[in-house]
Amino acid sequence: MSCTVAIPSSPVFSPSRRPLSCKAASASASPESVSVAASSPAQAAPPAGSPLRPFALRAHLREEATPSPQPSAAAAAAVSAPAGSVLKRRRPAPLVVPVCGGAAAAAAAAAVAAVESDPRNEVEEDGEEFAVYCRRGKGRRRVEMEDRHVAKVALGGDPKVAFFGVFDGHGGKSAAEFVAENMPKFMAEEMCKVDGGDSGETEQAVKRCYLKTDEEFLKREESGGACCVTALLQKGGLVVSNAGDCRAVLSRAGKAEALTSDHRASREDERERIENLGGFVVNYRGTWRVQGSLAVSRGIGDAHLKQWVVSDPDTTTLGVDSQCEFLILASDGLWDKVENQEAVDIARPLYISNDKASRMTACRRLVETAVTRGSTDDISIVIIQLQQFSR
């Protein structure tokens, strides 16, 4: 018969003398935070007479020989923190955003200064038959003057042939600049081919000039485009053409007569033409736009919209008689703020005096009127004295 004897002081039957107490964090602390504290009185070794004394001694020696792992920084902080305290997460280091250096600021200032000091920001040009005044707009987004003009008297060496134009660039100045530099040359070449031809041949020559100018600009693979309005005077005849929303207005005995119609996406016939070509016109923020992008429906350039924004001009031909006083060519910066008849009324008292200073004053006054009414666009105006080119 076996017999079991319980020894009260033996660790085999005695509960551990090393209780753990788990204290919940305070109500204000994070629910994820728990404070653990150990009541760690040193565990007494078995008494010398205990039969477990040799085993306890060997276990004690093994604990001393095994190095304890180094606690992490967070664990060390937890151990060093008072019992019952709540550990807080450390705030991350502040994010420092670098400020542009002096070189970058200086470069930006130099770029602005270059734009502001560009001599094309305000241009005056006059002759015996014409006056030109151009001014850069003051819109917030306006970076550089995008308008250009041309005034060529004695085109191709003929004193009775003259060519004038206003070119309103968009998406940069490159297209308008190219047109102003090259269209007069292309026009002279085309007019040589129809020397002595009738009005129909002349209109076809002007159309070929526009198409060639567009073709040559597209070869450069540059962005942007330009609206155009031109006037060709020869042998007592006037040929006015446009592609875009630059406009030509004739003063006929003091009555305004528009010789062009603006090519805008809002025009019903232009919208129908674009849709027949597979495009679309949409009203975006109150303005009708081709493919939701461009407000004009014709012009030079605009390669990404070339399928719909064509360079074919509309052309009007008429004879210069005694009632034809002067012709105003201007970009939409003027016409958006000044009506046709109003422009004639402002310019006529000054222009019919046949004085250079008065003609330039007429151009300036038209620009000032538009600016006073809120125009922030570039404005270019050419006024031509037509009687100088009558038969």
UniProtKB/Swiss-Prot annotation:
It is an enzyme of class 3 (hydrolase). Its main location: membrane. InterPro entries: PP2C, PP2C_BS, PPM-type-like_dom_sf, PPM-type_phosphatase-like_dom. GO terms for molecular function: metal ion binding; protein serine/threonine phosphatase activity. GO terms for cellular component: membrane. It catalyses: O-phospho-L-seryl-[protein] + H2O = L-seryl-[protein] + phosphate; O-phospho-L-threonyl-[protein] + H2O = L-threonyl-[protein] + phosphate. The chain crosses the membrane at residues 95-115. Residues 129-386 form the PPM-type phosphatase domain. Residues 1-53 are annotated as: Disordered. This is Probable protein phosphatase 2C 32. It comes from Oryza sativa subsp. japonica (Rice). The lineage of its organism: Eukaryota, Viridiplantae, Streptophyta, Embryophyta, Tracheophyta.
